[in-house]
Amino acid sequence: DSEGNKVFDYGEKRPFNGRTNNLATLIHDAVWNQTDNFNINVTAGTKFLRHFTFKVSGSADILNRRYTKMYNNKFGDAANVRGRGSVEALRIESLTFNQILNFNKELGLHNVSAMVGHESYRYVEKSVFAQRTGFPLEMSNDLVFGAQLEDGSSQTDEHAIEGWFGQVGYDYANRYYISGSYRRDGSSRFYKDSRWGDFWSVGASWRISQEAFMKNAKWMDNLKLKVSYGVQGNDNILDENKDPYYYAWQNFFEPYPNHDFGGVIHSTTGNRDLHWEKNTNFNVGLEFSFLNRIR
C-alpha cells in the first residue's frame, strides 16, 4: 500500500483455492506451545539390627502444557467464520511411592535373603479445551475477542495401582540358588470385586563353573544354568483406537443437550467381570562368560 505495508492477494477471484495465501498464513496465523515438565526423585534409607535395611523412595513426574492456535479472519481455513482461535490446557501427574524392607544374612556357606515391600502408583490427566470464532481483528491473541463459542470441553482421566510384594532367596556356596516371589496388585481399571490379582514366581540356578570338575577350565569365567516359572499380570486395557482405557467396568454417558436444556445419553455399557490378564512364563537359560571378555 502507500505506506509500504505488504498487501496480500486473498484470491477471491481465483477459479480455485480461493481465500488462500501460504505466505500470509505464515505471517498472520500463530501457534504457541508452552510446556513445563518437572521430574522429582527422593530416596531415603537406613540399616538396623545388622541384617536389615529399610528404603523409602518417591517420584513425581508433572507436565503442564498450554497450546494456543490463532487463525486470521482474512484468508485460509478460518476466513469463512471470520477467524478461529483455540486454547488447550493439559496437566498430567504421575506419582510413585515405594517402601521396601530387606534382610540378608550369611551363615557359613549358606546365604539367606528376604524382601517385603509396598508400592502405590497414581496417574491423573486433566485437560480443558475451548474454541471461538468471529474475531473482529485480523490477529487476536486471546479467545475473549471471539464472538461465538464453537467448542468447549474438559476431561479427567485417573488410574491407580496398589501393590504388596515379597521375595525370598537362598544359595549355598555361591553355587546352588533357589528363589520365590509373590505379588498382589489392585487396579482401578477393574470393579471392586475383581480388582485384585495374585502373581508369583519360583526359580533355581546352578553355577556349574564353581564345581570341582570345572577347576581345570580356567578359560571359563562363569557358567550358570537357570530355570524359572511364574505368573505375571497385565491391566493395560485399550480402546478401539488402541489408547489406554481406564473405565472399562463403568457405564459411560455422553453429553446430549436439547436446545438450552442439558442432557446425557448412554454410550457404553461397562463390564464388571473384567479382571487381570495373567500370563504364565517358563524360562530356561544358560549364562556364560569366558576369557574375561566374551559373554
Where are these regions (language model features)?
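N-terminal, post-signal-peptide soluble/periplasmic segments
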Residues: 1-5
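Extracellular/periplasmic, surface-exposed regions of secreted and cell-surface proteins
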Residues: 11-71, 80-295
